[in-house]
């Protein structure tokens, strides 16, 4: 057996986003789990009001408790906000390894650089032209 991998979804995601990754890992001998973050098990168009008051610390505390209950330290795999959560769990020594897929940056890190703005500045006008052509009524 390869070990245990815990897949952590991002904001507005659900554990289902990991179904293909889990199948891939399980096909290679891994045990996997993908817990739902607090208040992320409702349909996306009907989020519970509590979602707006749940903090990153709440998510980390929930997963901290789940990982401490496991018989071994897992590999944590996280995407976006789940990547930041995975990083924080690794920092607490709760994982044997971490895989961070485009993680959200910690609060003290400024991830937006001028080059990012330039890239978006080129894309946005093109999209606006395309959108205006699509949405402009025809006579």
Label the model's feature ranges.
Residues 78-82, 86:
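Gly/Ala-rich beta-loop-alpha elbow adjacent to hydrolase catalytic centers
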Residues 94-130:
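Flexible "cap/lid" loop of the alpha/beta hydrolase fold
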Residues 20, 88-92:
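Active-site signature of alpha/beta-hydrolase-fold catalytic machinery across serine-
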Residues 39-74:
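Active-site loop/oxyanion-hole signature of alpha/beta-hydrolase fold enzymes
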Residues 25-47:
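Conserved alpha/beta-hydrolase
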Residues 10-14:
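Active-site glycine-rich loops that stabilize anionic/oxyanionic intermediates
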Residues 76-78, 101:
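Short beta-strand immediately N-terminal to the catalytic nucleophile in serine-hydrolase-like folds
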